[in-house]
């Protein structure tokens, strides 16, 4: 099973409580607008949740995997306890977060580092310089205009990773030839 950072086993009750939190009027969750089509949530045993939607939604698998939707222990939506590979040690908004490896992480072969420090560097040039100078070990959201500069540096590895982002192509199907 999947364990929370506090050792509690995650159950369908936790999933339902978390989604209800994200859908709540007062939650402030960035995901609340994504979940408006959820009509009800029902536990079907300890490890299964049934989502009833207002109507069919082909994007629903993408919606429920949105990074804003964190699953927390029922009754504890604010402490930061989760199920991820790293446990939050400190958080200074807009400055940095420090995380340590979760020794009970449920995905084997992951969470390789003992500790991770996430530093907020807003300025793109400062971020690029920090990577080039070895002040940071990794960065995301590389500016495509400067990616070739990084590719020329033998000490920098560019990783292109597939995500859940997708593009739609809306078409008006009510007129010919459709």
Model-predicted segments: where are they?
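Gly/Pro-rich hinge or "lid" segments in bacterial periplasmic/extracellular proteins
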Residues: 57, 62-117, 123-125
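Solvent-exposed coil/turn segments that connect beta secondary-structure elements
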Residues: 1-2, 15, 46, 54-58, ...
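Alpha-helical secondary-structure segments
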Residues: 11-18, 50, 84-85, 112-115, ...
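Ligand-site clamp/hinge motif
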Residues: 1, 104-149, 164, 177
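Aromatic- and charge-enriched surface segment that lines or borders ligand/interaction sites
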Residues: 1-28, 50, 130
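Ligand-binding "clamshell"
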Residues: 148-160
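Alpha-to-beta junction loops
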Residues: 15, 47-49, 132-141, 156
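Surface-exposed binding/hinge segments that line
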Residues: 10, 31-74
